[in-house]
């Protein structure tokens, strides 16, 4: 450490950092609105990069009546009981999200990775919004790459989308698809294949046991795939290391989350849950 004069105050970022509220070019916004206006079945996909801008993204989804799918790492950023939530997409995901991916005619992605694990279909027309320019079209070409801060961009699009008159068909279909999936999950509760408690039972019980403000640390492996597929988020804060190769993450992460929050008056007593397989634990 460097010595400081008695009574010296800490420095600030003033004069060193500019605003992060980067707005896309007006011409790009015009292109995006033209595609949104012509789409009959748009969907929104959010990744972990959109975690601080979900209020703006959900407001945009509501103005478009567009289903919101999440990547696995973004699970919980929109509660599964929201009328426009479609759950997780990809190998760890729900058949609800998969169905809407197949049926959509336009993808609007915010802060999402396009790795193979996410399940985003590259042949679909894609508008990709990201604050990180290096993330745009990183894996393949997209129809409209949009460089901008996610909250600022989503808010701007939501304001302009007020002139669009979306139908309610997709919202109705969401309710129908969730009903089908929940019925299927219920049927799996009693089907253990002779191997004891199954994943559907574990995560149905967990969903009933923990409050909506809990923190959930998730490990890797089959237990994690099952968590993404079966657990219905109520808005819990979900922590995960990524995808594979980091077995053993959940339990120490849960301890760290507990230690980091319990001294804060607003978080005192907040439940913390660790989800691990036998190898991870």
Give the predicted meaning of each segment:
Residues 45-46, 69-71, 109-110, 148, ...:
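General beta-strand structural signal in soluble alpha/beta enzymes
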Residues 74-177:
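Glycine-rich, acidic loop regions that bind phosphate or pyrophosphate groups
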Residues 178-269:
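Active-site diphosphate/adenylate-binding microenvironment
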């Amino acid at each position: 450490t460097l010595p400081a004069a008695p009574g010296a105050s800490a420095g600030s970022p003033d004069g060193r950092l500019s605003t992060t509220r980067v707005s896309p070019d007006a011409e790009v916004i015009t292109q995006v609105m033209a595609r949104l206006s012509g789409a009959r079945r748009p969907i929104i996909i959010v990744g972990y990069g959109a975690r601080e801008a979900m209020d703006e993204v959900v407001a945009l989804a509501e103005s478009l009546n567009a289903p919101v799918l999440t990547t696995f790492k973004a699970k919980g950023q929109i509660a599964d009981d929201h009328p426009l939530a479609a759950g997780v997409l990809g190998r760890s995901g729900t058949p609800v999200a998969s169905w809407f991916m197949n049926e959509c005619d336009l993808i609007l992605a915010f802060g999402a990775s396009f790795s193979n694990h996410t399940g985003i279909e590259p042949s679909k027309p894609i508008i990709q919004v990201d604050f990180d320019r290096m993330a745009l079209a990183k894996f393949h070409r997209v129809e409209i790459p949009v460089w901008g801060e996610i909250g600022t961009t989503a808010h701007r699009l939501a304001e302009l989308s007020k002139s669009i008159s979306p139908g309610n068909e997709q919202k109705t279909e969401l309710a129908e698809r969730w009903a089908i999936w929940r019925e299927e999950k219920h049927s799996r509760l009693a089907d253990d294949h002779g191997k004891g408690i199954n994943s559907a039972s574990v995560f149905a019980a967990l969903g009933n046991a923990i409050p909506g403000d809990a923190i959930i640390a998730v490990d890797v492996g089959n237990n994690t795939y099952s968590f993404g597929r079966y657990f219905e988020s109520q808005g819990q804060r979900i922590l995960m290391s990524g995808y594979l190769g980091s077995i053993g993450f959940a339990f120490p992460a849960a301890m760290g989350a507990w230690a980091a929050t319990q001294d804060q008056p607003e978080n005192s007593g907040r439940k913390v849950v660790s989800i691990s397989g036998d190898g991870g634990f």
